[in-house]
């Protein structure tokens, strides 16, 4: 029998493990992008390869996202989280030592694969240990993810200037290895308490998500949010430069866009958890997107900060989607299946966003078609969110027995 104090300590340990893991989940992406030109000069790869590096994150997130629920059933959620952090740490450490393009690509894929597993396994862990404080722990987790996006982007170049690009690229491995430590401790405590085994679950659960309107709604909401967000991260500087802005101003607007994502991570999960059906919030976010698109298309330099602020409020649907993974599932097994499906399908679609945005621009020599593409994506987002936000759980929807959860 585990005492109340022991249980509290165990939850605190898992909380620390989740928070530290969240700080790892984007490091391999934003620590590389600012250094791509320096690395290319030394190793010698083309701009096409830089584009390949740009597509690897979402591709790995998609592939490993779809595989993670099965891994979680085989190894257990905690062990899967440990493996994810070790993959991320090893990948980030070793890729910084490579001298050829293919090794750099392969080991970047290893790091990003670990992060893809982490993306999917953390929500069901939150569900398993913190079902009574979902909004709070979800906020902590999502803020950690946003920090892992923002911090490397700001410090990668100064670190490279001071110590070289290899140190700047590899130092983030320390965060990955540090995040693995509390998971080792969690597993040891479980073994000592004879509580390390995962309860048996229906192994057909993943396939059932494919038949669920909740699953497809979540995938549409998450995927289109990610597609628009990645597209804007990539193209904001070019859109503003085409209107006469300086590169420095374009970079500052990208930073503002990222910062607003951090702000929304604080409030969106709790707002989502307090509402039986948070669809009106999604409509408000979609409206922000559409107004920003119109402004950036028609008169980008008339009020650029306003357009970017509105654009930055739109992706509040990202932390909402991550929170809904747990709010729209009954068990941690259902959460794992929904998380894998949502992020696997979502990132598969999202990886096409920046590419197609650029293709439409090149084909038309303007931004009209590109912003029309973004508008269609927002329409799909709203359609998916309508299904995702309904007060029901995925386990009931795949059995065609909808039951209210609030």
What are these regions (language model features)?
Residues 13-47, 65-68, 232-237, 353:
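Extracytoplasmic
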Residues 32-33, 213-265:
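Extracytoplasmic gate region of multi-pass secondary transporters
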Residues 44, 76, 97-102, 131, ...:
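Helix-breaking motifs and short loop linkers at transmembrane-helix boundaries and internal kinks
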Residues 63-102:
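Conserved MFS/SLC helix-loop-helix module at the cytosolic interface between two early adjacent transmembrane helices
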Residues 107-144:
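Cytoplasmic helix-loop-helix junction between adjacent transmembrane helices
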Residues 132-133, 140-188:
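Helix-loop-helix hairpin linking two adjacent transmembrane segments in secondary transporters
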Residues 276-321:
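C-terminal transmembrane helical hairpin of 12-TM major facilitator-type secondary transporters
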Residues 329-367, 374:
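A late C-terminal transmembrane helix in Major Facilitator Superfamily
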């Amino acid at each position: 029998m585990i005492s109340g104090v022991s249980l509290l300590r165990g939850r605190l340990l898992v909380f620390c493990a989740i928070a530290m893991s969240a700080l790892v989940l984007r490091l391999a992406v934003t620590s590389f992008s600012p250094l791509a030109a320096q690395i290319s000069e030394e190793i010698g790869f083309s701009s096409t390869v830089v584009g390949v590096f740009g597509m690897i994150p979402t591709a790995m997130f998609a592939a490993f996202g779809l595989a993670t629920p099965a891994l979680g059933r085989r190894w257990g959620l905690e062990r899967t989280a440990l493996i994810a952090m070790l993959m991320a740490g090893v990948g980030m450490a070793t890729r910084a030592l490579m001298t050829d393009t293919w090794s750099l690509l392969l080991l970047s894929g290893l790091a990003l694969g670990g992060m893809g597993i982490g993306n999917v396994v953390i929500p069901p862990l939150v569900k398993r240990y913190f079902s009574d404080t979902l909004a709070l722990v979800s906020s902590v987790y999502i803020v950690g993810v946003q920090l892992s996006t923002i911090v490397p982007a700001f410090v990668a170049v100064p670190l490279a200037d001071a110590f070289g690009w290899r140190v700047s690229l590899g130092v983030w491995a320390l965060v990955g290895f540090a995040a693995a430590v509390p998971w080792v401790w969690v597993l040891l405590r479980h073994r000592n308490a004879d509580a390390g085994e995962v309860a048996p679950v229906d192994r057909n659960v993943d396939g059932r998500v494919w038949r669920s309107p909740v699953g497809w709604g979540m995938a549409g909401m998450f995927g289109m949010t990610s597609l628009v967000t990645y597209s804007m991260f990539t193209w904001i500087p070019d859109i503003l430069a085409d209107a006469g802005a300086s590169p420095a101003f374009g970079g500052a607007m990208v930073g503002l866009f990222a910062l607003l994502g951090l702000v929304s991570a604080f409030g969106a999960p709790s707002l989502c958890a307090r509402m039986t059906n948070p669809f009106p919030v999604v409509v408000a976010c979609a409206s922000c997107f559409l107004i920003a698109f119109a402004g950036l298309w028609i008169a980008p330099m008339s009020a650029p900060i306003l357009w970017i602020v509105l654009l930055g409020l739109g992706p509040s649907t990202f932390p909402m989607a991550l929170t809904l993974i747990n709010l729209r599932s009954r068990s941690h097994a259902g959460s794992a299946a929904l998380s894998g499906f949502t992020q696997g399908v979502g990132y598969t679609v999202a990886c096409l966003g920046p590419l197609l945005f650029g293709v439409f621009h090149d084909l038309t020599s303007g931004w009209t078609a590109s912003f029309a593409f973004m508008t269609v994506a927002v329409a799909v987002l709203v359609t998916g969110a309508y299904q995702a936000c309904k007060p029901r759980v995925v386990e009931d929807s795949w059995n065609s027995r909808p039951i209210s959860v609030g």
